[in-house]
Amino acid sequence: PFYKVHGTVRLIEELPQFEQISAEFFGGAVSLKQNVGSQNKKGLYDLSGKVDLTRLKNHFSDKVGAQSRQLLNALNGNIGFKGNLALSNNLTDVNLNLDLNALGSNLPQPLDKKRGSNLTGQFKYQSVLNDSTSNRSSQWTAQIGKNISLQGRLNAQGIMSQGIGIDASPVMPDSGIGINLQANDLNVDDWHSLLYPKIVATKNPAQRSAPEVSQTGLSRDVDGLNVLNASVRNAVALNRQWPNLTLNAKLVNGIWQIQAKSPRLEGQVQYIDRPGFDLVKGKLSRLNIPESSSKVFGAGGKPETQATPKTVPLNSIPELDLVIDQLSINQYKPGAAVIKTLNIPNKISIQNLVITNAEAITKGSGEWSVDAQGSNEAIWLDLKAEIKDLGRVIAHWGSPKAVEGGKGLVTAKLDWSGPPYDPDLDTLGGKIAIALENGRLLQVDSGIAKVIGVFSLQSLLKFASFDIQGSLGNVITTGTSFNKLSGDFVIRNGVARTQNFGMQLNQARVATSGLVNVPKQTQDLRITIFPTID
């Protein structure tokens, strides 16, 4: 839209001829005058001016899709341009040099920019009228600095497609936006929050008293992101580092088809963007979940250590329906896993969790929740492990050569404050029951905690190391076999109590009662040995 237009226009037989035009254009001034060197070439003009991005955003706010609007809203300042415009009956050509020094960008890395920092660009646009159909099509290219390339087109049917290349060649989808990216650092969480914002809406109180997390319908954004190819040396997703990540994603019928590969992640999944909570569904050949990241990326992509690692809001975690062939959690390697969750605001219900390997099958369910303010995370789990080879199960959880053989059943009902990956052991509560048989202790100082290492409670029963040679002789030594190992434990505020933990050996029965402080790893126990006399 042009305002306050001044100048001279000569109406000639073919096209209007502009001699000197000035106007207000998106909050800035624009000037159009005939090129002084174009006496023999009609329709060539010098074009210069400036655009205020606030006015530009206001104009297009209701004319573009939600994702394009999110991108525009992250820009501020103004853009200067200078170049030429060529007009003919069938063709419009624009060639501009861009002054982007006064442009500011709050987009995540690598597209952030401070106002006042030097940046230039070039923009070329061409529009062609087809005489036979009277339809017009357009195409354009742009170069922003040394790293960003753009290509776009608008066909005669009004379908727009645009490719963006960041340190890579642009990739053009059939419609919408395609991004091809190579970067040293990329925070996927920041980009996802920008392009897929969640809003909280409340339905009729008579229908539902709790707030419902809803989405802005971005999967129907026809001019939004449709293709993403990325190769990132240091990627952050779910506040975790994923090195050397290659990602290929395409939006098909509103569903993202994603193929990912990294030393910590490989497989194919669907990411379904939907009202309420998104869904991640598919199969991974491997998933190694690292510890949460303690670094953020500052200006220029330089890593900066933050005092407290950023946590992922529970309501931003999608529902999961995954099959994982090889699951690792930090240094632990439990095996294959199946997980299915169902989300409601402030709560993730773990409907089905199955961890399978040659040594055991563990099945479970549970809940991960926060309060109405999104704080005070809490977990409860109901687990049952059918142990086929206790020694190999313990080896999976990081303590090889502690026990040989052993089979049976371990059940646990546990709860604590904090997320599942960072429990507050001072709040640990619940019950554990152990019923195992036919095993052999290879390390008497390894701790019976290793017996239930499958639950990551290595310190829970550390008292049962039975390294008590001084008073009990050689009743229990390295290589001692046990016929039965059983007991029940009640846990409250991180303190586990038992009255009936015992081990049946060929030569004796060992009975233990007392308590263990899990966070402090201290114990107060009474151990009684009943020798077997032939």
Residue ranges and their predicted role:
Residues 144-145, 153-155, 166-170, 186, ...:
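Alpha-solenoid helical-repeat scaffolds
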Residues 17, 134-136, 252-254:
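A short, compositionally biased
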Residues 202-218, 296-310, 467-471:
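Intrinsically disordered, low-complexity segments enriched in small/polar residues
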Residues 129-205, 277:
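Long, domain-scale non-catalytic interaction/scaffolding regions in large secretory-pathway
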Residues 170, 216-223, 309-314:
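Short boundary motifs at domain starts and secondary-structure transition points
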